[in-house]
């Protein structure tokens, strides 16, 4: 994409109402613009990152055996009255009436809807187990929306729901999602630590939240130094309950807790390996058994023909929030540093002198070759000062920058910069092309 044809309204100054780094950088990098309190329009650069995050999450959900569907944003109040949560949920739920005076709500969560949907379309215990998920925008009327997409009123969520005939099978599906979340966050370039959590209004007796360490996190977290080791993708047989349980056990054996769940005994055992930091919740999973199936009459005939209440779990990832968390965990004084897996473009190509015929010929040719090789490239072909072009590329955080200037063009060389390390090297155009395409083929 040529930057001269792109919509990238970068800002030199940070708006006064932006308090945390992710909010500041998303505004300055032209990723979002606020349209109302806690509600944002996603501009082309921000939307590309959202889509890349969605793709990874979809792949890991499918690997764990989940099926994608899509539920509407509007729900009937009657569904929530079935579960008993309509009056209990509070003012965060936006309630409306249609022209026929029917009560509706803008879904803050989907347990009731998915329960009714699956209840009315399964016939027997042989139809289980099942995991369904969807990715949809939600609305919660936060009393004080702040911190940009980290605590907005409208946000994009991935919600999954599991359905099982007994608790043993239900915990197997819980472990499927536990491992799928570890792999999702690892692929996104994040170290997410699973921590035992309260179930809150969702309910149930088993819950973990996944916390990303970040200096500007929203809460204190305490953890064993083993969690500072590099993350890795977990090769798992999702159909093997014992193997999955072993993986889960390995990942909860080292101490990690939020401030509310601290354990003085385990902290004493950790000794000088105990660490304290700030963290951001990016995922939350629950196993709540029959909390929704019983009041909503969701039973299926078991092997003996007798009705059995269905065991359920729910599993959420805040996708728009996750984007903010990635920035909080990966930035410097000059801007964002995107992990390669989610970067909106892989390469930022800078032509320092568009009026120089040699520069333009080399830049145009390299741009066309990179695009043909499947390398997403943002080509800065604007008639701007070099300093402004460098600042823009550092701000938006693309993994690689290729700089073409008049002196280098005469010699057939370019400057290649790695955004994360800051390392620069002067190499031939051909070597730069080979390096960038080789890295693409390895991913």
Swiss-Prot record:
PROSITE patterns documented for this protein: AA_TRNA_LIGASE_II
InterPro entries assigned: aa-tRNA-synt_IIb, aa-tRNA-synth_II, aa-tRNA-synth_II/BPL/LPL, Anticodon-bd, Anticodon-bd_dom_sf, Pro-tRNA-ligase_IIa, Pro-tRNA-synth_IIa_bac-type, Pro-tRNA_synthetase
Keywords (A to Z) from UniProt: Aminoacyl-tRNA synthetase, ATP-binding, Cytoplasm, Ligase, Nucleotide-binding, Protein biosynthesis
Protein name (Swiss-Prot/TrEMBL): Proline--tRNA ligase
Domain of life of the native organism: Bacteria
Class of this enzyme: ligase
Gene: proS
GO cellular component, one term: cytosol
Localization terms from the record: Cytoplasm
Catalysed reaction equations from the record: tRNA(Pro) + L-proline + ATP = L-prolyl-tRNA(Pro) + AMP + diphosphate
Keyword match Cytoplasm: yes
EC number: 6.1.1.15
An example Gene Ontology biological process: prolyl-tRNA aminoacylation
Family the entry assigns: Belongs to the class-II aminoacyl-tRNA synthetase family. ProS type 2 subfamily.
Pfam family, one: tRNA-synt_2b
Gene Ontology molecular function, alphabetical: ATP binding; proline-tRNA ligase activity
Organism: Zymomonas mobilis subsp. mobilis (strain ATCC 10988 / DSM 424 / LMG 404 / NCIMB 8938 / NRRL B-806 / ZM1)
Role summary: Catalyzes the attachment of proline to tRNA(Pro) in a two-step reaction: proline is first activated by ATP to form Pro-AMP and then transferred to the acceptor end of tRNA(Pro).
Binding partners and assembly: Homodimer.
SUPFAM superfamilies (UniProt xref): Class II aaRS ABD-related, Class II aaRS and biotin synthetases
Gene3D superfamilies in alphabetical order: Anticodon-binding domain, Bira Bifunctional Protein, Domain 2
NCBIfam families per the UniProt record, alphabetical: PRK12325.1 (NF008979), proS_fam_II (TIGR00409)
CDD domains: ProRS_anticodon_short, ProRS_core_prok
Main location as per UniProt: cytoplasm
């Amino acid at each position: 994409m040529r930057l001269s044809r792109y919509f990238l309204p970068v800002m030199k100054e940070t708006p006064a109402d932006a308090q945390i780094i992710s909010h500041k950088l998303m505004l300055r990098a032209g990723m979002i613009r606020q349209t109302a309190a806690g509600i944002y329009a996603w501009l082309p650069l921000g939307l590309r990152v959202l889509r890349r995050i969605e793709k990874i999450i979809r792949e890991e959900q499918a690997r764990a055996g989940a099926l994608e569907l899509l539920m509407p944003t509007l729900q009937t109040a009657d569904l929530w009255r079935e579960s008993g949560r309509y009056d209990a949920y509070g003012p965060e739920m936006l309630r409306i009436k249609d022209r026929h005076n029917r009560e509706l709500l803008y879904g803050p969560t989907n347990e009731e809807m998915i329960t009714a949907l699956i209840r009315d379309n399964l016939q027997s215990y042989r139809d289980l187990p099942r995991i369904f998920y969807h990715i949809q925008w939600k609305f919660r009327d936060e009393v004080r929306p702040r911190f940009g997409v980290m605590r907005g009123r409208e946000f994009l969520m991935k919600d999954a729901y599991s359905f099982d005939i007994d608790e043993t099978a239900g915990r197997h599906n819980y472990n499927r999602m536990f491992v799928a979340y570890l792999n999702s966050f690892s692929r996104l370039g994040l170290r997410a630590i699973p921590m035992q959590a309260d179930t809150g209004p969702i309910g149930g007796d088993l819950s973990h939240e996944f916390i990303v360490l970040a200096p500007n996190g929203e809460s204190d977290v305490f953890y064993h130094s083993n969690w500072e080791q590099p993350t890795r993708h977990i090769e798992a047989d999702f159909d093997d309950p014992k193997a999955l349980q072993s993986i889960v056990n390995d990942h909860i054996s080292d101490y990690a807790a939020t401030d509310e769940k601290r354990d003085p005994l385990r902290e004493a055992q950790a000794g000088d390996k105990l660490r304290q930091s700030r963290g951001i919740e990016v995922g939350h999973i629950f196993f709540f058994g029959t909390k929704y199936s019983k009041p909503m009459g969701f039973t299926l005939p078991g092997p003996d023909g007798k009705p059995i209440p269905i065991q359920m779990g729910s599993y959420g990832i805040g996708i728009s929030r996750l984007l903010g968390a990635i920035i909080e965990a990966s930035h410097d004084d000059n801007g964002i540093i995107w992990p390669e897996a989610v970067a909106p473009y892989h390469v930022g190509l800078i032509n320092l002198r568009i009026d120089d015929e040699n520069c333009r010929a080399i830049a145009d040719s390299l741009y066309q070759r990179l695009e043909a090789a499947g390398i997403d490239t943002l080509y800065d072909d604007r008639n701007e000062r070099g300093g402004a072009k460098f600042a823009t590329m550092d701000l938006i955080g693309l993994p690689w920058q290729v700089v073409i200037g008049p002196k280098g063009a005469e010699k057939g060389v370019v400057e290649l910069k790695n955004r994360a390390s800051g390392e620069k090297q002067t190499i031939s155009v051909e070597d730069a092309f080979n390096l960038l395409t080789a890295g693409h083929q390895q991913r």
